[in-house]
Amino acid sequence: ASLPDGAGNITPNAEFNFWVDPEAARVTLRSGIPIELSPLNVSRKSNLTADWYERMVEIDNPLTALLKETLGKRFEQSPERSWYMYDQIAVASLIDPSLVTTKSLYVDVNIDHGISYGVSVGGENIWPGAEGAEAMPVQYGLDWTRFIEMFIERIQLPLPASEMR
């Protein structure tokens, strides 16, 4: 999802997963199941630099080998570039909710075909046309240093022998 003060990653305002199937996103958001939304906005507060990457891969294990394979070439080609961490933040917030701050917003997805198809919209109050939208915690803040330290610590843990085949 991409909400106010954020931008999309597939169109100027739509996030890929919602844009691909906004109808499914809308059904899910309106389903009443407990949801904490981790939008692009919070992920764009991450800043995976070459220095952080080098710290991650100091220890050899299957996870760091995968990181070397997937990110190593990117940092070799563009060492000055940084990368956002998306799914990793969503998962980390399940492990330690204090890594993120949230704001309660009503969230809906535009399903009208046009230039704003698949765009998620959030507001503190319900608005005309969004009847049925649910209020949910939406992640806005990220303690980047605590997050990346936890991430590095976790990926450097030894894996059980059964998973090292």
Language-model regions: role of each:
Residues 1-13:
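Class I SAM-dependent methyltransferase SAM-binding "motif I" and its flanking Rossmann-like core
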Residues 16-23, 30, 35-165:
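Conformational coupling and interaction surfaces
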